[in-house]
Every structure is written in C-alpha cells, then in structure tokens.
Amino acid sequence: MRKIIHVDMDCFFAAVEMRDNPALRDVPIAIGGSRVKRGVISTANYPARKFGVRSAMPTAMALKLCPHLILLPGRFDAYKEASVRIQEIFSRYTSLIEPLSLDEAYLDVTDSLHCHGSATLMAQEIRQTISDELNLTASAGIAPVKFLAKIASDLNKPNGQYVITPDEVPHFLKTLPLSKIPGVGKVSAAKLENLGLRTCEDVQKSDLAMLLKRFGKFGRVLWERSQGIDERSINNERLRKSVGVERTLADDIHDWSDCETIITEQLYPELERRLAKVKPDLLIARQGVKLKFNDFQQTTQEHVWPKLNKDDLIATAKKTWQERRAGRGVRLVGLHVTLLDPQLERQLVLGL
C-alpha cells in the first residue's frame, strides 16, 4: 500500500506578501488584476475570504464585496523563490515529487525511512520545517492514493493536516460528495445529480456500463474513484525546471574561506546527488549561486554552463562575495542549476 502526501500552501501568494510586509497581515488583501483591466483574483488572504472574496473571482466583484480590499499586482519572482525552497524541503524526504503548481505537490513517501516510515509524522515535519524556514504555513493530506490525499489536504485548512488510512477509505468514501473528486466540476456534478448520483456510495451501487455509455472515459474514472481506485504514480518530471540546495547558517559568516568550505563540503556534494537523480549525465542550461546577508537582502549570480562544474561555482561565489557583500555577514549560501528545456536538450544531444 502506498503512502501519498499532498501538500497545499495556505493562500500562498497572499501569505508571501503578508510575510514580507506584516502590516498586511490583518487586513483584506488579494493578488489580482485591476478593475479597469477586468482582471481576476489569483488568491486572497483569510480576512478577505470572510467577505466572500475567492480565487478566480472577477476583481470588480471582489471590490463590491469588500470595497476596502487591498489589491496587489503580484511579485512572481518572490513566489517562485519561495516555491523552489519548498521543493527543496520536500526533497529531504523523497525524490518522488510531483509539483502541481507553485504552491502544491504530491509526495510519494512509501519507501522513505524518515520518521520511522510514518507518512503522518513526515507531513507534520515538512509543515513545521516550512514554517520554521520560510515563515509560511501549509496544509497536508495523507492517504494511500493521490486523489484522496488531495481531498484530505483541504479538510483541516489552514495549517493543518488530515489522514485517511487504508482501513478508513471505505467509510470515508461512503458519504463523499462526487463534487469533491478532482475533475468533477459543477456541470458534471449537475448531470450526475440528475441521475440520482450524489455520493461515491451512489456510484458504487450503479452500473459501470451505464456510466461508460453516458460519460465515456470519465465514467470509468468516476467509477474507479468511487471505489477508492487511483493507480496514477507520481510524475516527478512534471514542472521540474531547476535543482538547488541551500543552507541557512546558525551564525553569520564573514570570511570567504568559511563560505568556500560550506560550498565544497556540504552544498556541492548534495547538489551533485540531487541532479544525478533528475538528469544524470545530461546537459544543464545555467548554474549559479545565491547569498543572503544579515540585513535579509540577497543576491544571485548565474551564467550559461553546459555541465555542473564545482570550480566554476566556487569562482562565481567568490566573485559575488567580493563584489556584493559590502562587509555584511552572510546568513545563507545556495547553489542551483537551471535545467535545459527537454526539446532543446534532445536537439543538442542529437547534434553532438
């Protein structure tokens, strides 16, 4: 039996904004386009949700519901950076990671030895680590299959988790509304209700041939989900565009020799290991370094390089240290590579 964790960040874009500007924490905010441009809301914080503001809502409607709503245009570089760090935390527990977007992912921890193999404890640790290292909260669902883990992650939001053990699956499905199954939208739910199908138990009692006749392939998927069947594996190639590793230091460092030691003894070996799991012996697009200073400002430096190269990374880090540190202590050191687009990589490899 598999152990699947679905991690979903809590109002992610808005949470990053509130973290970086605490004055926004208790006021209604939303990330989205302006009313003039007929934009839509990407996400809203919980104070805004109390007024009925929701994701995918037209901005004009959101402002009618909450006239004092603060609209923010979005800082996608900041969201991407936080997402990369979250993925790095996931990778401490398993290499079987399937990102669904910047703020959610599936993890298969079936064979992980962390926390004595307990997926529940791993989910707790992952959420706590995200809170400690990024000052953001996440919710999680734990189940033996993907779709149930995704449903479970929404049952104890925000900043909570819900476990569906294999023994609990039949009871959980008995009263589960079909509208909760990922992929069942409002239109499909209405069609199913017209047939008297509202819960998974209703589908369990129905004829598969009838479902196939009326809904085709979707009918089979619906029947399988209602039985608790979901054989999809983790697709860990999905959206994977970079590999990185970084360390937040217990004490600020001021000497380049300390930084070089961290890179050569800790970061580079770990980066090699992670890259080997994703793209062994294949080309990369760029590699680079990141330094964060004790005033919380940070800088990155990268350039085109076809293969992972320790000497080049050390030289890049030293140049960045000398030119941008300005006497400040360094509290975080990171290395990363940007992966080559698969189609371009294939063209280059075939041309060699």
Curated annotation (Swiss-Prot):
Residues of the site described as Substrate discrimination: F13
Record carries keyword NAD: no
Enzyme class: transferase
Cellular component annotations (GO), alphabetically ordered: cytosol
Domain UmuC residue range list: 4-185
UniProt-listed InterPro entries: DNA/RNA_pol_sf (IPR043502), DNA_pol_Y-fam_lit_finger_sf (IPR036775), DNA_pol_Y-fam_little_finger (IPR017961), DNA_polymerase-Y (IPR050116), DNApol_IV (IPR022880), IMS_HHH_1 (IPR053848), Rev_trsase/Diguanyl_cyclase (IPR043128), UmuC (IPR001126)
GO molecular function: damaged DNA binding; DNA-directed DNA polymerase activity; magnesium ion binding
UniProt cross-references to PROSITE patterns, sorted A to Z: UMUC (PS50173)
Gene3D superfamilies linked to this entry: 3.30.70.270, 3.40.1170.60, 5' to 3' exonuclease, C-terminal subdomain, DNA polymerase, Y-family, little finger domain
GO BP annotations, alphabetical order: DNA-templated DNA replication; error-prone translesion synthesis; SOS response
Catalytic reactions on record: DNA(n) + a 2'-deoxyribonucleoside 5'-triphosphate = DNA(n+1) + diphosphate
Cofactor list: Mg(2+)
Function: Poorly processive, error-prone DNA polymerase involved in untargeted mutagenesis. Copies undamaged DNA at stalled replication forks, which arise in vivo from mismatched or misaligned primer ends. These misaligned primers can be extended by PolIV. Exhibits no 3'-5' exonuclease (proofreading) activity. May be involved in translesional synthesis, in conjunction with the beta clamp from PolIII.
Protein family per UniProt: Belongs to the DNA polymerase type-Y family.
UniProt-recorded name of the protein: DNA polymerase IV
Organism whose genome encodes this protein: Enterobacter sp. (strain 638)
